[in-house]
Amino acid sequence: MHVVILGSAAGGGVPQWNCRCSICSLAWAGDSRVRPRTQSSIAVSPDGERWLLLNASPDIRQQIQANPQMHPREGLRHSPIHAVLLTNGDVDHVAGLLTLREGQPFTLYATPGILASVSDNRVFDVMAADVVKRQTIALNETFEPVPGLSVTLFSVPGKVPLWLEDASMEIGAETETTVGTMIEAGGKRLAYIPGCARVTEDLKARIAGADALLFDGTVLEDDDMIRAGVGTKTGWRMGHIQMNGETGSIASLADIEIGRRVFVHINNTNPVLIEDSYERASVEARGWTVAHDGLTLDL
């Protein structure tokens, strides 16, 4: 199984377009300690030829250009991207669908709830129905979006997208609006969970034994954005677990066997983005890799 992390940042990327927090300021200045990062997306292939795109970032055209595996290869129109799978309806995961509207056939997969958030917004009708097939997938149903890749979706604690929030919103609920994915090929297993509000025993049992885990790395501490002075929301309020602390992802997942542990979907205010920082060293010392754009895994 071949895995490419096309975009490793959370919504807005690094640096964010209007942000001068300490981390974004380093990125704007071209400081080599903070790599620029695009918004959350990965691609997976069983053979290096046919690819499944997981989440369609607003930066997808830039991501395709930066990764030769994703380039058109034949004829006047072509793409090695055969299918797209959404793990939630967040803007940073669906807006890139508008870029994929240029008459290229593929199948869009998501749970009924996630797909409804796309179908109910007519702007996505630019993806012609006779070109882009929309396929609903039930939780815990195994399907094959690309020959040789078996995928199963499962609920994880989360919340509805920001643009669908209302007074009835529940943070940490396990529904079909935020899902994890287990991808299998050639006897290898990859768990991809870019958004998760907390780690449950069911989640640990689901991903135990995976050869690699790509997990929500939005915030180091629950109050990262508040500390940075650029926001008032906590990680929990946004539906994202913190890395540190007794109930954080590092401690919560420490007792299960997993091959490689990689943080993705990293917010611009997370200090692990600074490569020579104490925070980065601390995370790496506990067995985790901080993803960057273009990071590849061969399982």
Swiss-Prot record:
It holds the Pfam family Lactamase_B_2. Keywords: PQQ biosynthesis, Transport. The keyword Membrane does not apply. One of its GO terms (biological process) is pyrroloquinoline quinone biosynthetic process. InterPro entries: Metallo-B-lactamas, PQQ_synth_PqqB, RibonucZ/Hydroxyglut_hydro. Pathway: Cofactor biosynthesis; pyrroloquinoline quinone biosynthesis. Belongs to the PqqB family. May be involved in the transport of PQQ or its precursor to the periplasm. This is Coenzyme PQQ synthesis protein B.
